[in-house]
């Protein structure tokens, strides 16, 4: 096995192991409030490192994973391991100094002067503070505190917004497995076009894609399962249920025997060979359950076309997981351990401030300069109607989305959704949209973006070519919503 099979270049100064050791189960091990022994856990990380599995993935909320990694880094692998972490801010307004504080906290925990890869998660795209966070993270990257930026659980539309707005990201970490192929189409295509790599987690589905569950009765969703098992049991249910899942396991078993491998390794190897995938993340329960030799062997074989066809045939019989990457954290069905967001966030605050106006109306303001100068609101609620002003891809002094009409359109619809949320409605309440475009040749990507966001809502709509104010803007949109009394 040569080195190129084992590692992958995310950026000129960052090469990772193609099998990344995930540490999110540290949080599960500590869920009863009992911290694991950090020195022993750091020593367990060293065993992976010594075996050539030098890359570890964690987050600010994975229990004491960052602290453990810092001990490991200082004692055993200074400058030789790749420590990938995440920042998942609490929903709501974020200030510049909070971003620096979060990065400094990660550096302190990791006992490092530079974060190899800082991955960012956004809870609510309708709240534009997520863009502020990324622009400020990019400033800290320029400053040298961060080597590379990545995303986690971003969908295709918002990855497009990020890339077209000049934010330099090299990865998007998403759930991507035999059960969940949401990343295989538009996401993979966009990543290939922009040289962004997917880091695939969930490839063994919390251990369900193994011999242990072949021909076994269906487990119940109870606290006797690990958090990981609770999460991926929900994916199994969404993909067609236990009987359909058993057919997938039988296909995996067939391919595993042919390749003299384990079912888990076949499942992960299949994902590793998908377009745009830079690495697969396989979880470790440090000090409890290590699979070092098996993870090493994942890099020692490849699947022939016959094996892939057997797996594809089994996948095609499953029910596709709905939506795009990361939707499980933003809209029903919430495919999380708890089945909701209770383990993650308490509430999603309104994206924009609202104020009581005259004659019983309420207005929402997005903070753009012209709202004050021209005397208008982003949206006004009167009775059960919400009227949203003509909205462009403006955020502070920036035009978001560059020269990509679809990226601009998606950000415009984010702002519209944020204004409606701030006045007590949802995008489902929209009954009318009007779209004004600068260039007639942009009509189709803008219409398709509208179709993605309003696919099941289908409001009345008009699209016309217009002379927009501001040469940088390709699309302007307004909306009307009627909310339930």
Residue ranges and their predicted role:
Residues 206, 222, 335-414, 418-428, ...:
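N-terminal presequence-like segments and the immediate start of the first folded domain
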């Amino acid at each position: 096995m040569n080195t190129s099979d084992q590692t992958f270049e995310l950026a000129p100064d960052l090469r990772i192991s193609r099998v990344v050791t995930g540490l999110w189960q540290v949080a599960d091990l500590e869920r009863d409030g009992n911290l694991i022994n950090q020195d022993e856990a750091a020593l367990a990380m060293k065993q992976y490192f010594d075996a050539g599995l030098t890359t570890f993935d964690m987050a600010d909320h994975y229990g004491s994973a960052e602290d453990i990694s810092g001990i490991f880094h200082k004692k055993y692998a200074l400058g030789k391991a790749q420590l990938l972490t995440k920042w998942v801010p609490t929903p709501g307004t974020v200030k510049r100094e909070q971003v620096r504080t979060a990065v400094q906290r990660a550096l302190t925990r990791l006992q490092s002067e530079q974060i190899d890869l800082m991955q960012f998660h956004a809870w609510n795209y309708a709240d534009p503070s997520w863009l502020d966070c990324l622009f400020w993270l990019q400033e800290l990257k320029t400053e040298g505190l961060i080597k590379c930026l990545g995303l986690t659980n971003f969908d295709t539309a918002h990855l497009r917004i990020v890339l077209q707005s000049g934010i330099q990201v090299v990865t998007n970490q998403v759930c991507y497995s035999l059960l969940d192929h949401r990343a295989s189409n538009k996401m993979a295509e966009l990543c290939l076009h922009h040289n962004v790599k997917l880091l695939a987690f969930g490839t063994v589905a919390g251990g369900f894609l193994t011999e242990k569950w072949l021909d076994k009765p269906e487990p119940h969703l109870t606290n006797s399962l690990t958090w990981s098992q609770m999460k991926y049991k929900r994916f199994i249910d969404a993909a067609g249920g236990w009987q359909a899942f058993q057919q997938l396991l039988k296909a995996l078993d067939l391919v595993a025997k042919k390749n003299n491998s384990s079912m888990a390794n076949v499942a992960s190897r299949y994902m590793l060979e998908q377009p745009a995938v830079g690495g697969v993340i396989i979880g470790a329960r440090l000090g409890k359950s290590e699979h070092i030799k098996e993870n090493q062997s994942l890099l020692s074989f490849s699947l022939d076309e016959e094996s892939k066809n057997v797996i594809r045939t089994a996948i095609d019989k499953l029910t596709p997981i709905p939506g795009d990457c990361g939707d499980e954290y933003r809209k029903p069905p919430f495919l999380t351990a708890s089945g909701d967001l209770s383990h993650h966030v308490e509430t999603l605050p309104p994206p924009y401030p609202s104020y009581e106006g005259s004659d019983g109306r309420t207005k929402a303001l997005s903070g753009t300069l012209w709202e004050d100068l021209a005397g208008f609101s982003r949206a006004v609620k009167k009775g059960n109607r919400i009227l949203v002003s003509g909205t462009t891809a403006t955020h502070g002094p920036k035009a978001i989305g560059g020269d990509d009409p679809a990226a601009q359109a998606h950000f415009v619809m984010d702002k519209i959704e944020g204004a409606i949320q701030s006045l007590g409605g949802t995008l489902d309440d929209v009954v009318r949209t009007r779209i004004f475009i600068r260039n007639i040749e942009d009509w189709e990507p803008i219409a398709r973006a509208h179709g993605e966001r309003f696919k099941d809502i289908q409001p009345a709509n008009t699209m016309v070519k217009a002379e927009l104010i501001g040469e940088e803007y390709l699309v302007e949109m307004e909306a009307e919503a009627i909310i339930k009394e």
